[in-house]
From Swiss-Prot:
A Pfam family per the record: SlyX
Gene: slyX
Similarity-based family: Belongs to the SlyX family.
Residues in the signal sequence: none
InterPro entries named among the record's database cross-references: SlyX
Protein name: Protein SlyX homolog
Lineage: Bacteria, Pseudomonadati, Pseudomonadota, Gammaproteobacteria, Pseudomonadales
Species of the source: Pseudomonas putida (strain GB-1)
Domain of life: Bacteria
Amino acid sequence: MTLEMRMVELETRQAFQDDTIQALNDVVVEQGRVIDRLQLQMAELIKRHEEMVGQYGSEGEEAPPPHY
């Protein structure tokens, strides 16, 4: 393999690696956005749960069924 052929091979590999790195970066950025949305949704669900527990009491405070 000549030096020129090796250089072409290395440049070709680098081009493919650059494309792969960019694609992976795009995925990581999108996953970050998804995580941010999920964290907001989770915070909202926790808030709603705490409000419901405050209104209706916790599950442990439930009266026993009438047959006891």
